[in-house]
Amino acid sequence: MPTIQQLIRTERKTLKTKTKSPALRGCPERRGVCTRVYTSTPKKPNSALRKVARVRLTSGFEVTAYIGGIGHNLQEHSVVLLRGGRVKDLPGVRYHIVRGSLDTAGVKDRRQSRSKYGAKSPKE
């Protein structure tokens, strides 16, 4: 613990927190273009084929983003909107693609949690 004299001489350094989504540059979302759409396998206890895309952002970064929901219409050169949020069992995937905006279609026949997947209200 420093003495009062030491604190007068040099003030305490403020701790800088590292951002978990540096490619967004402090913005809530970023636009980008898909350079590659593929599937990836998750870490050890889980087993699946997770849908991911490599995206070049307007901020100049190229990142890997997760495509949530069942089925998607993305291919190379699709324009997508990216938000933060990692996928715990996919190393290096720190972003999510926003469903139902730009070239990304919403999930078909989705009835619950529709706003998260860009699905319209079901007609009855």
Curated annotation (Swiss-Prot):
Keywords: Methylation, Ribonucleoprotein, Ribosomal protein, RNA-binding, rRNA-binding, tRNA-binding
Entry's Gene Ontology molecular function annotations: rRNA binding; structural constituent of ribosome; tRNA binding
Signal peptide feature range: none
GO cellular component: small ribosomal subunit
3-methylthioaspartic acid found at: D89
Region Disordered, residue ranges: 103-124
Disulfide bridges in this chain: none
GO biological process: translation
PANTHER family according to UniProt: 30S RIBOSOMAL PROTEIN S12 FAMILY MEMBER
Oligomer status and interactors: Part of the 30S ribosomal subunit. Contacts proteins S8 and S17. May interact with IF1 in the 30S initiation complex.
Its biological purpose: With S4 and S5 plays an important role in translational accuracy.
Family designation: Belongs to the universal ribosomal protein uS12 family.
Protein name per its UniProtKB record: Small ribosomal subunit protein uS12
Species for this entry: Prochlorococcus marinus (strain NATL2A)
Source species taxonomy: Bacteria, Bacillati, Cyanobacteriota, Cyanophyceae, Synechococcales
